[in-house]
Amino acid sequence: MEFPSTSLFHRLLGGIMCLVMLSAFQSASSHLWRRSPQEINVKRSGLRNMPSLANVTVEQLSRHLNAGDITSVDLVRAYISRIEEASEFKAVLQLNPDALSLALALDQERREKGSRGPLHGIPILVKDNIATKDNLDVSAGSYALLGAKPIVESSVVSTLRAAGALILGKTNLSEWGNFRGLNVSAGWSPRGGQTLGAYYPNSTPEGSSSGSAVAVALGLSAAAIGTETFNSILEPAEFNSVVGLKPSRGLVPNDGTIPISSRQDVIGTLTRTVKDAAYMLNNMAGRSERDERTWNIPFKEIPNFVKFCSGTDLSGVTVGVPRNSFPADPTSPIMVSFEAALRTLASAGAQVIDNADFPAADEFKKLNQQVKGIVRSSEFKRDIVRYLSTVENNPHDIRAAEDIIEFTKRHKEEEYPNRDIGKFLWTQAEGVDVESEKYNEMVEQERFFGGEGGILGAMDKYNLDVLVVPSSFGIGNDLAAKMGFPVIGVPLGFYPENTAIQLEDCEPHLVRIAPGMPYSITFITKAFSDGVLLRVAHVFENLSKVNEKGPKPFNLPVTELSKRSEDKNNL
């Protein structure tokens, strides 16, 4: 885990010492508690019944904070300890040196003015490609942008702060959002090292929002935000058995992120439950003057997405299964679980339409990766220049994709050429330019494959509310990403004990499939139908209870709130 500087490390250490003294003073001065000993015992009893920090929800934490059972300071101290205990996973890249002072201020505000809402005092982690105006860096995991400060903060981070959320730190990621090379392991960055998955030793976390997913799985924060161009939220959510939500493009502002494609990038959430994702979305969605895509939100007021997360009835909902969009081995554990999931949805009252296929799926599958990447490469080439124009104190004078390539080649920390730059090099290929005819042809192809040739073709033909596919793989998520449609991944199951271990092809050959590793189910719908998506996902989650029944992360941190709170009271 990296701290921004020695002086900032001392500030954090000083803050911890200050809080230890403050806790001792509170213990010696009983009138500061404003409760009788009997009341304190009642509160402690309630706290002991609270789930582990690896399982507790945002809603539960908010309730305990409002009841006075715990404070935000307690939460920050506990999460910092857990982050230290889980350092081998390299999920958290950088701690906010001001986290404890922010927690004190939020606790005081709660006492004096009441709560701002469900996120008041809740510590969250932010992916290291999202700009924050504080003492945290934003570098996409690369030393090239270390010290390059954003002029303005991401609108999403600002709205989360306004809701009372506490930015605990930055998470590790696949460098440059996994837009560097073809032989670079997911979850690796020069600054953060190799993030590891939570469910099996030396396993891949997938990416690029790797640290955000692993942190939530291990209980290193209450929730986290990540970004997705294609599968960068959904895959790490799947491999770490958490909920990954990629909202509709334009529902959540995307300014202040280090881009791959401003046309396709979306900020989303990694949470323990679907309802937690809804709480986060309530405080992220909305119009921003800095993101013109949000100006086209089709409703005057942002819905209360939490209201969609209730009950177990799906009567009136039609769910389609596009079988031609994913591999179908009926004996695989994923497919066995998927077929059971379809029965669960039907038992809840949903009408399940099988073989609601994408009209042009076979044609789309024939396109090779580089042809598909022409659009992303062209947009990265343009959009990274735009982003770099918004930073100050740019110590390495990085102004364009060419500068990133040269920096990567020159600096040994970037581990070139062992870790290649194949995707970067696509930006230098002929015709890779947003003004080129080839680019515009590919954009039109994407609209067809995602629209009438894909998702819209299937949904309109069969009058569907939602599509459902197994795992985060297949072409469904790819087409949804190209169209800006919302997608949510929910835990579906775990590989059985007799599963043969499979490794990644690229070094360091992390474990990809193994006994007890998780997989997910994915729901897709049309733009700005996020509420329907959350409703279906919440019902499935409630009926299946996959994480309650299944294996747990193999090496969870040990610090818990109840222990820290009792220790504090005994100082």
Task: Kindly label every feature range from the protein language model.
Residues 2-111, 135, 340-351, 406, ...:
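An N-terminal boundary/leader segment
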Residues 49, 120-141, 308-323, 374-451, ...:
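Short helix-loop capping/hinge segments that flank enzyme active sites or metal/cofactor-binding pockets
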Residues 60-67, 144-148, 265-272, 523-524:
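Short, well-ordered beta-strand elements within core beta-sheets of diverse protein domains
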Residues 76, 104, 154, 304, ...:
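Acyltransferase
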Residues 85, 162, 166, 217-328, ...:
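Structural helix-boundary/capping segments
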Residues 90, 222, 463-465:
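Conserved acidic residues
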Residues 120-265, 294-295, 322-324, 470-473:
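Short glycine/serine-rich loop/turn segments
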Residues 436-440, 444-493, 503-509:
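An extended, acidic, His-containing surface patch that forms the Zn2+-binding/catalytic region
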